[in-house]
Regions:
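A short glycine-rich, Lys/Arg-flanked "PGG" loop and its adjoining helix->strand segment in the class I
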Residues: 79-91
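Short glycine-centered segments of the SAM/dcSAM-binding site in methyltransferase folds
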Residues: 4, 93-94
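Conserved Class I S-adenosyl-L-methionine
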Residues: 139-202
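Short alpha-helix
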Residues: 120-134
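A conserved beta-strand element that flanks and buttresses the S-adenosyl-L-methionine
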Residues: 65
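Short catalytic micro-motifs in class I SAM-dependent methyltransferases
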Residues: 68-69
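Conserved class I S-adenosyl-L-methionine
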Residues: 96-122
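Class I SAM-dependent methyltransferase SAM/SAH-binding core
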Residues: 6, 11-54
């Protein structure tokens, strides 16, 4: 009940919102992001701020989440993020770092998207090494999520560049990719989304 939670790169804050709904913490979980998502959940505290800047505050937490965000950091900034996160954990506090599984990833892609995703996942593997070296004592877990999504919604997600590997693609490339997905899939798209989780305990 008294746990303090911070979600770095929270997006819409779905995870901490679900935790708050279930456990009703006295301190509302805090979600930070450099982009204010218009659909951010209302039962958490959202702050639009850079993670490194926020972690320089002396506030302590029992749980810090970093979900699918590491690829936005340079090596130097990632090490700084990890060092600050460790400092901000209470005794017995946990740091959870989530990222996409890098091998045999099943996310439905068009050709250009696949190339960008593979490049991003290759870099993630390198970043995992930096994380392991910095945190030293960690445990790895994998979570499988069965996804069933309508083709219409998935096309909207691609068009909105909801998946970060799409951010660098030109509009023409995205539009061509939309046509590829339209031809490749019927009404519903089914796949298994696997997340890797690195756990550090203070």
């Amino acid at each position: 009940k008294n746990s303090k939670i911070l979600d770095i790169g929270c997006g819409r804050a779905n995870i901490i919102s679900a935790l708050q709904k279930k456990y009703k913490f006295r301190n509302k979980p805090i979600g930070i992001d450099i982009i204010a998502n218009k659909n951010v959940k209302k039962n958490i505290v959202f702050k639009k701020i850079d993670a490194l800047k926020y972690l320089e505050k002396k506030e302590k937490y029992d749980l810090i989440l970093i979900k699918q965000t590491i690829h936005f950091f340079t090596n130097k900034r990632l090490n700084r993020l990890l060092n600050l996160a460790k400092k901000r954990l209470n005794p017995k506090g946990k740091l959870l770092i989530f990222s996409l599984k890098t091998k045999n990833n099943k996310i439905p892609c068009f050709k250009k998207m696949k190339i960008k995703l593979q490049k991003s996942l290759k870099r993630d593997e390198y970043l995992f090494k930096i994380i392991k070296k910095n945190l030293k004592y960690t445990k790895d877990f994998y979570f499988n999520f069965k996804v069933v999504i309508s083709k219409k919604k998935y096309l909207w997600m691609i068009k909105s560049r909801y998946i970060s590997c799409l951010l660098e693609l030109k509009e023409k490339e995205v539009n061509k990719g939309l046509d590829e997905i339209k031809l490749k899939y019927k009404n519903n798209i089914k796949f298994v989304d696997t997340l890797k989780c690195i756990l550090f305990s203070k």
